Amino acid sequence: CAMTQTSGRSDKILVVDDDSRIRDLLRRYLTQEGFEVFQAEDGKALNRILLRETVDLIVLDLMLPGEDGLSICRRLRAANDRTPIIMLTAKVEDVDRIVGLEVGADDYLGKPFNPRELLARINAVLRRRPVAEAPGAPSSENEVVQFGPFNFDLGARSLHKSGQELPLTTGEFAMLKALVRHPRQPMSREKLAQLARGREFEPFDRSLDVQISRLRKMIES
């Protein structure tokens, strides 16, 4: 079933795909799973929806007419929009998926796909969010980890270097959290995938390597 916040409302999913059959399929399937679903056929329609709605996750097709999925993802992240993004790609080349993660997508799924697999990925990404808490309530995770010039605030889900915030995607946050919670421990890809994503490592999945590389560049720069 769909994950809900403490207010009891359903999570809002925005599906962006120029194929109306895929949009309708996902609208029906995700609505049955308890989500509130919005649909957009391109970047302009996405912009109109985001002006009036705050969504919890975007399912974004890579190949769109006009502004493509990579450009949309890059634009949203440049505007400091941290809404989780799962990218759909019919392209078989690894490079397209890797670039998607490098510009800030949280996960990807190749077409054709099983809607149940997309649902599992949606729920996994949404689980990485902070739990909404009552105003004034102490954070359930108020730990701040310091290393070198960095402050990693688990409650605020933020990383600062010498006072300057470095934006993290939900996937990067989950990965950094797993690493700082297990310092000086050898970490296999299998263990890291389980800790950061709650799912088994897939042998041909390069996304772990990409997110580790992004974190390393962020920390070493």
Task: Give the location of each predicted region.
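His-Asp phosphorelay/catalytic-motif detector in bacterial-type signaling
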Residues: 10, 54-56, 80-84, 202
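Hydrophobic alpha-helical motif in two-component signaling modules
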Residues: 50, 59, 70-73
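Positively charged, aromatic-enriched patches within helix-turn-helix-type DNA-binding elements
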Residues: 105, 158-221
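Charged docking surfaces used in two-component/phosphorelay signaling
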Residues: 24-32
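Non-catalytic signal-transmission and effector/linker regions of two-component phosphorelay proteins
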Residues: 1-14
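Active-site beta3 strand of CheY-like receiver
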Residues: 54-59, 64
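Short hydrophobic/Thr-rich beta-strand motif most characteristic of the beta2 strand and flanking loop
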Residues: 34-43, 49
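Basic, amphipathic DNA-recognition helix from helix-turn-helix-like DNA-binding domains
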Residues: 68, 74, 78-146
